[in-house]
């Protein structure tokens, strides 16, 4: 079975690469993103819209309300193995994402050592200026998406349930938006009515939070097996 693995830090174009590869191969994309398993966080987690998918198929490891919390890495890994097994007869899958904990589960599991031909695309972290330009553009799009709720509207809606607030505080983007509101002594719904200067500061702050996360991803990701090549058969990370 052919597995095409696309991974790297946030804001490095993994989803676009996956969509292009899905168009080329006809294979579905399975998201290796635990936060994207919550549809209530669609915009803030970077779930691509129907238009962005361009007719390709995208699968998620779960479909859960936020009140259940973010799916644990171990459970996500079990779901991942199950999905790969289910699609074995279809000839292949594209795996795309950047969950440190999920990729580490893969690196520590012998399941990935046999019966797979690996095609690995590793997206690297760009220099700070390039990254920030891309991240700011992404945040602007999240504030005014072509479809669905904005990241702030998602936050406002979910903030109404106090039991969800601790979960939101653990997620990039939402966390900084809450901090920004607190620092400026405004309520979360007032984030929907910021003037241009304040909005620019919010955008910059969220992008900075993404940069911090991207640097952590770059440091913590498991290393690709030194023996790997296109069509390589063996463990993609050499096991840790």
From Swiss-Prot:
EC number, UniProt record: 2.5.1.27
UniProt keyword Disulfide bond, yes or no: no
Matching Gene3D superfamilies: Crystal structure of tRNA isopentenylpyrophosphate transferase (bh2366) domain, P-loop containing nucleotide triphosphate hydrolases
EC category: transferase
InterPro entries in UniProt: P-loop_NTPase, Tzs
GO MF entries: AMP dimethylallyltransferase activity
Highest taxon listed in the record's lineage: Bacteria
Annotated Pfam families: IPT
Catalytic reaction equation(s): dimethylallyl diphosphate + AMP = N(6)-(dimethylallyl)adenosine 5'-phosphate + diphosphate
GO terms, biological process: cytokinin biosynthetic process
Key words, A-Z: Crown gall tumor, Cytokinin biosynthesis, Plasmid, Transferase
Function: Transfers dimethylallyl groups to AMP as part of the biosynthesis of cytokinin phytohormones.
Protein family membership: Belongs to the isopentenyl transferase family.
Official protein name in the record: Adenylate dimethylallyltransferase
């Amino acid at each position: 079975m052919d597995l095409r693995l696309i991974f790297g830090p946030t804001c490095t174009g993994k989803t676009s690469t996956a969509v292009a590869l899905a168009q080329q191969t006809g294979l579905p994309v399975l998201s290796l993103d635990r936060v994207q398993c919550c549809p209530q966080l669609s915009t803030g987690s970077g779930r691509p819209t129907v238009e962005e998918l361009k007719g390709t198929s995208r699968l998620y490891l779960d479909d859960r309300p936020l009140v259940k919390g973010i799916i644990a890495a171990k459970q996500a890994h079990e779901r991942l193995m199950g999905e790969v097994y289910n699609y074995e007869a279809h000839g292949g899958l594209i795996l795309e994402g950047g969950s440190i904990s999920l990729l580490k589960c893969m690196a520590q599991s012998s399941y990935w050592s046999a019966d797979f031909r690996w095609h690995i695309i590793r997206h690297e972290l760009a220099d700070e200026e390039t990254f920030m330009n891309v991240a700011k553009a992404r945040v602007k799009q999240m504030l005014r998406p072509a479809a669905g709720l904005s990241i702030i509207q998602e936050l406002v809606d979910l903030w109404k349930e106090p039991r969800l607030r601790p979960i939101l505080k653990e997620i990039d983007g939402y966390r900084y938006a809450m901090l920004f509101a607190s620092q400026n002594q405004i309520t979360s719904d007032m984030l929907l009515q910021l003037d241009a200067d304040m909005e620019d500061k919010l955008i910059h702050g969220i992008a900075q939070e993404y940069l911090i996360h991207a640097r952590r991803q770059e440091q913590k990701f498991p290393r690709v097996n030194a023996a790997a090549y296109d069509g390589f058969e063996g463990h993609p990370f050499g096991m840790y």
